[in-house]
Amino acid sequence: MVSVTGCAVLAMTATLAGALAGNAMAQTPDAGCALPSEPEGIPAALDAAISGPADKDRGCMKALLIPDARMLFASLGADGTSSYRLETVDEWIARVKARGRARLEERQLKFHIERYGNIADLWSSYALHSDGKQVARGINSIQAIKDAGGWRVSSIMVQAESATAPLPKEYLP
């Protein structure tokens, strides 16, 4: 058994707090990519970061997500078979850039937030448009955390609507 004195605990706590504060400060986004001050601002921030031409600078997307964030894209086949693809933010950016100059716009349709202290879960329906035409819609499940700079996304799970999984009416505008 290890015995730790009160002074040692305070020293370890101060060291950890300093490391965490330094980590959060080092990851603060540029002024042009202000983080949302409340979780209600996350859907609009994501729409702005995702929308645009494929070769758009994705610095704001990287700033909005924590460094180790993951994006999971789930799908449901016509036969009911479930599959998924897990990506880092950098992998997502590379895949988007491969589209060429195609411009996409993501718009949140409706969202619901559950919040406790510095964590929040957002359940959001979206529509994806290309050249003004809707090409997809689905659900985003977004987990977020508040740090020194504002609210950031730790993970996003996405499932596009399909014939076997239509959007529920409560998530339509």
Show the residue positions of the predicted features.
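Surface-exposed, charged secondary-structure patches
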Residues: 27, 70-71, 83-134
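Bacterial N-terminal signal peptides
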Residues: 6-19
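Acidic/histidine-rich, surface-exposed loop or edge segments in extracytoplasmic proteins
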Residues: 43, 69, 73-77
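A mature extracytoplasmic/lumenal domain signature
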Residues: 65, 75-77, 124-126, 140, ...
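A short, polar/proline- and glycine-enriched secondary-structure boundary/capping micro-motif
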Residues: 82-84, 132-136, 163-170
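Hydrophobic pocket/interface hotspot
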Residues: 61, 69, 122, 144
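Short, low-complexity N-terminal intrinsically disordered segments enriched in polar/charged residues
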Residues: 3, 22-64, 171-173
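Short beta-strand edge/turn micro-motifs at domain boundaries
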Residues: 121, 137-165
